[in-house]
């Protein structure tokens, strides 16, 4: 099945149910590919092709392992695709906990054989924040994702706090995965959340499927 067809099937199911900095050189999460002109996460200006799939204009694609030393914010209108087998490691020894804030769309396309792994370097609960999806985030697919050691408390400089996505006071950690667009769609399929300090999932809106 083509990537686009698989995503469409997962999101159709959701509708039916409820009618950074990068330390390693192999991928820069702030560019749409390895030589992407410092576009600050704005996505590609042309169709992107990788060994796995072809992605539409406006895409960010992470094809290889990466280490985040600061938060990543995906703007409205931009889609981030994380390909099978990719490991994203969040550094814990930072002043502002790492968060993946999705104001656009996110597709973690792991498989049973090659899951997407999102973890931390020291492997302790609350090492990093979580995946926080904004009020305009239309689609999120987490397919075969192993997510661990999230739940850190945000600071006033955290993008989740500045965008008022979860906490308006600094009184506790963020969830490992939070979705809050009442008109959005999300799928969490064959995922493993573990060693998380706060809530594993938290939903304040949207149409979703979890299985």
Q: Where on the chain are the PLM-derived regions?
A:
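Bacterial N-terminal signal peptides that target proteins for export
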Residues: 1-9
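A ubiquitous, low-specificity "background" feature that marks scattered single residues
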Residues: 8-11, 30-31
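C-terminal motif of bacterial Sec signal peptides marking the signal peptidase cleavage site
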Residues: 18-21
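Beta-strand/loop edge motif enriched in small/polar residues
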Residues: 23-211
């Amino acid at each position: 099945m083509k990537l686009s067809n698989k995503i469409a099937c997962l999101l159709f199911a959701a509708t039916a149910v409820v009618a950074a900095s990068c330390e390693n050189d192999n991928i820069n999460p702030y560019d749409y590919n390895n030589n992407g002109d410092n576009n600050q996460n704005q996505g590609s200006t042309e169709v992107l092709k990788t060994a796995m799939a072809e992605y539409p204009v406006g895409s960010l694609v992470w094809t290889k392992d990466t280490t985040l030393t600061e938060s990543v914010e995906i703007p409205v209108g931009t889609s981030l695709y994380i390909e099978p087998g990719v490991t994203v490691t969040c550094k814990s020894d930072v002043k502002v906990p790492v968060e993946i804030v999705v104001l656009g769309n996110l597709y973690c396309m792991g498989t049973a054989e090659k899951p997407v792994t999102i973890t931390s370097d020291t492997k302790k609960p609350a090492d990093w924040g979580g995946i926080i999806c904004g009020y305009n985030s239309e689609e999120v697919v987490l397919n075969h994702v192993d997510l661990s050691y999230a739940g850190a408390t945000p600071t006033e400089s955290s993008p989740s706090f500045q965008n008022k996505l979860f906490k308006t006071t600094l009184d506790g950690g963020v969830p490992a995965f939070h979705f809050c667009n009442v008109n959005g769609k999300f799928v969490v399929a064959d995922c493993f959340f573990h060693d998380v300090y706060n809530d594993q999932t938290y939903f304040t809106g949207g149409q979703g499927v979890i299985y």
